[in-house]
A protein has these predicted regions:
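C-terminal lid/capping helical subdomain adjacent to the catalytic/cofactor pocket in oxidative enzymes
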Residues: 413-509
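N-terminal Rossmann-like FAD-binding beta1-loop-alpha1 element of flavoenzymes
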Residues: 8-35
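Glycine-rich FAD pyrophosphate-binding loop
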Residues: 27-49
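Active-site/ligand-binding neighborhood in enzyme catalytic cores
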Residues: 119-251, 255-258
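Mid-domain catalytic core of redox enzymes
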Residues: 5, 29, 218, 244-390, ...
């Protein structure tokens, strides 16, 4: 081994929730670990907290709730004294009014007003009398359930903002999963009975289910958790190589270890070696850096991502709304969701005279939004807040922009086959390589699910063989909505669930 090369038991690519969980737990078991992180300043990935002039921004919003007792215990171990309990509140904002989220049909009809709600009901009855016969797409499924008018108000705009494709190109199975339990007919009938005093316990068209009324949150944002994990890893005597990206990884058969070349921002390279490699880097990037080139390289290049940016505005005002965030169902603006950072934690906003909100825009890396200047994005966000009637632009006193590439793995019509091909080849060729986390597995994981995959990867290393299947950890669409924290003792909580995201329909030949 060259003197320039440094050896560790395990090399970890990426210091997000999955990478940091793996690094911390491996250190507890006595393994030497090197973590390689592209960001020169911060760990935490999409779960980091960004600070600007004393203001703290949560990128995407992270409620700390998990049904996995192992995950909850790890959070408490890392941050024993810094969690606060926060009220849970999210609503839909449409034409100057707030609507319940999850959507409650009778509440929606009441707030839409007599004329609009009447038109919605006519549209609903028309859909019931003349339903779409060939229901394969998201739009046709929703229209059959609620009518075209309610579809246009509460489903079409936001869904297309998030995923960047028309609703007619999304599959109906995703709609059925995401909107289950909501019935307009039941809601109207229930409302009539209530008006006659015949029903004292409204279900408002929703199946009765328990929603979280509060959640735990690190008092200085989610990055506080991952900074604590970093500090514990360093206390174990392990190391971080910040501002470095994976350049090439190859298995040295003669030496029996990985040889990993990493590159700093200035172009300088260095080599590390390790017995095991854990990657939370995007699948597309990992495969492109493996040598020799995997046969599944074309599959990796076909994987796509949805990107994301937050424009934080400081406003001379009281809080614009009490919610953690609101969903914007207006097609006249590009913003998809707005966070109120103080509602997450008062310590996120240092000045009581100012409000601080984060306008979230979904985009593709390199498109017009992503490529806009920070000044242009701050001006856009200010104008859109004013257009929505939420603030006077003259009250905006500052702003900052945070870009997050590859925030969401795209589930198009072919992604599953691509991932299966990549997984089959890499598992057969590299028994000591494990892929973890959201981007590392191209799966729409919450941070607790990402942590679970890392926990299983660590068990495989500790036990000396690939006994635990990381890919058995599924995603739960309602994980933050129902159930009690720590209900399940371990990763089994996620093995019985699936979080669907929209799939693009195949075009007819």
């Amino acid at each position: 081994m060259s003197p320039a090369e440094q050896h560790s038991d395990v090399a970890i690519i990426g210091a997000g929730p999955a990478g940091l969980t793996a690094g911390y737990l491996l250190g507890k078991h006595g393994f030497s670990v090197t973590l390689v992180e592209k960001d020169a300043e911060q760990v935490g990935g999409i779960s980091r907290t960004v600070e600007h002039a004393g203001f703290r921004f949560d990128i995407g919003g992270h409620r700390f709730f998990s049904k996995s007792r192992e995950v909850v215990d790890l959070w408490d171990e890392l941050l024993p004294n810094d969690f606060i309990e926060r009220p849970r509140m999210s609503r839909i904002y449409y034409r100057g009014k707030f609507y319940d989220y999850p959507l409650r049909a009778f509440d929606a009809l009441r707030k839409l007003g007599l004329i609009e709600s009447s038109l919605c009901m006519l549209s609903f009855f028309r859909a019931k009398l003349f339903p779409n016969k060939d229901v394969r797409s998201f739009d046709k499924w929703v229209i059959n359930q609620f009518g075209e008018r309610l579809f246009g108000i509460f489903f079409k705009t936001y869904t297309e903002k998030v995923w960047g494709m028309p609703c007619e190109d999304m599959s109906a199975d995703w709609a059925a999963q995401r909107i289950k339990g909501l019935s307009l007919g039941k809601a109207v009938f229930d409302g009539i009975k209530r008006s006659l005093g015949l029903n004292r316990r409204p279900n408002d068209g929703m199946q009765a289910k328990t929603l979280l009324e509060s959640f735990r949150y690190p008092r200085k944002g989610p990055g506080m958790m991952w900074d604590a994990a970093r500090d514990r890893i360093l206390e174990h005597g392990n190391r971080f190589l910040m501002g470095h990206a994976l350049h090439q990884a190859s298995w040295d058969e003669a030496a029996g270890h990985w040889r990993i070349t990493i590159k700093a921002g200035g172009g300088k390279t260095r080599v590390i070696t390790a017995d095991h490699l854990i990657s939370s880097a995007p699948v597309r990037e990992l495969v492109a850096r493996l040598h020799p080139m995997p046969k599944s390289m074309p599959n990796a290049m076909a994987l796509n991502y949805r990107d994301f940016l937050t424009v934080a505005l400081m406003i001379r005002s009281e809080d614009l709304f009490p919610d953690n965030w609101i969903y914007i169902h207006e097609d006249k603006v590009k913003v998809g969701r707005i966070q109120n950072f103080r509602s997450w934690s008062p310590e996120m906003v240092p000045d009581e005279a100012l409000a601080c909100v984060g306008l979230e825009y979904f985009c593709f890396e390199g498109d017009g939004l992503w490529s806009s200047t920070d000044e242009g994005l701050i001006a856009l966000a200010t104008a859109e807040l004013a257009r929505l009637g939420l603030c006077d632009p003259r009250d905006v006193v500052g702003g900052a922009v945070v870009r997050q590439e590859k925030a969401y793995p795209v589930y198009d019509d072919h992604y599953a086959g691509h991932v299966a091909a990549i997984r089959a080849e890499l598992e057969a060729r590299y028994p000591t390589l494990q892929m973890v986390g959201r981007n590392g597995m191209h799966r729409y994981n919450n941070q607790d699910h990402a942590m679970m995959t890392a926990m299983l990867a660590v068990r495989n290393i500790v036990e000396g063989r690939r006994r635990h299947d990381l890919w058995a950890v599924n995603e739960d669409a309602e994980y933050h909505e129902a159930g009690s924290e720590g209900d399940d003792a371990g990763v089994a909580a996620a093995l019985r669930s699936e979080r669907l995201v929209p799939r693009r329909l195949k075009k007819a030949a």
